[in-house]
From Swiss-Prot:
UniProt-listed Pfam families: Fer4_21
Binding site for [4Fe-4S] cluster 2: C63, C83, C86, C89
Protein's gene: porD
Cofactor note: Binds 2 [4Fe-4S] clusters.
Name listed for the protein in its UniProt record: Pyruvate synthase subunit PorD
GO molecular function: 4 iron, 4 sulfur cluster binding; metal ion binding; oxidoreductase activity, acting on the aldehyde or oxo group of donors, iron-sulfur protein as acceptor
Organism, as annotated: Pyrococcus abyssi (strain GE5 / Orsay)
Signal peptide boundaries: none
Domain 4Fe-4S ferredoxin-type as annotated: residue spans: 44-73, 74-103
Length: 105
């Protein structure tokens, strides 16, 4: 069987594509949300009420971003550079110490 006259062209095109294109679903820098601030597009932001907080850490545990850390007393602190306003923290809070309020810019 004769070799296709287009084989060299196809191989060259495949090589160029694999060198130039990023395949989907591959994270070249896993965990890059720490590098790239992700909080600029939220519509709602968490507002914290310290007097209602029992320091259960559920907001910290369930936050899908690195947007909540705990201060030296164990109270949550929100990093609005990374908070996307998803509301999971407010939903998980058993004492309603976190309320989602409309973002004002």
């Amino acid at each position: 069987m004769a070799e296709s006259p287009f084989k060299a062209d196809i191989e060259r095109a495949q090589k160029e594509l694999t060198e130039k294109m990023t395949p989907g679903a591959i994270a070249y820098i896993p965990g890059s949300s720490v590098i790239n601030k992700t909080g600029s597009w939220r519509v709602f932001r968490p507002e914290f009420k310290k007097d209602k907080c029992v320091r259960c850490f559920l907001c910290y545990i369930y936050c899908p971003e690195p947007a909540i850390y705990l201060d030296e007393e164990g109270y949550p602190v929100f990093d609005y550079d990374y908070c996307k306003g998803c509301g999971i923290c407010a939903n998980e809070c058993p004492t309603n110490a976190i309320e989602m309020v409309r973002e004002v810019k």
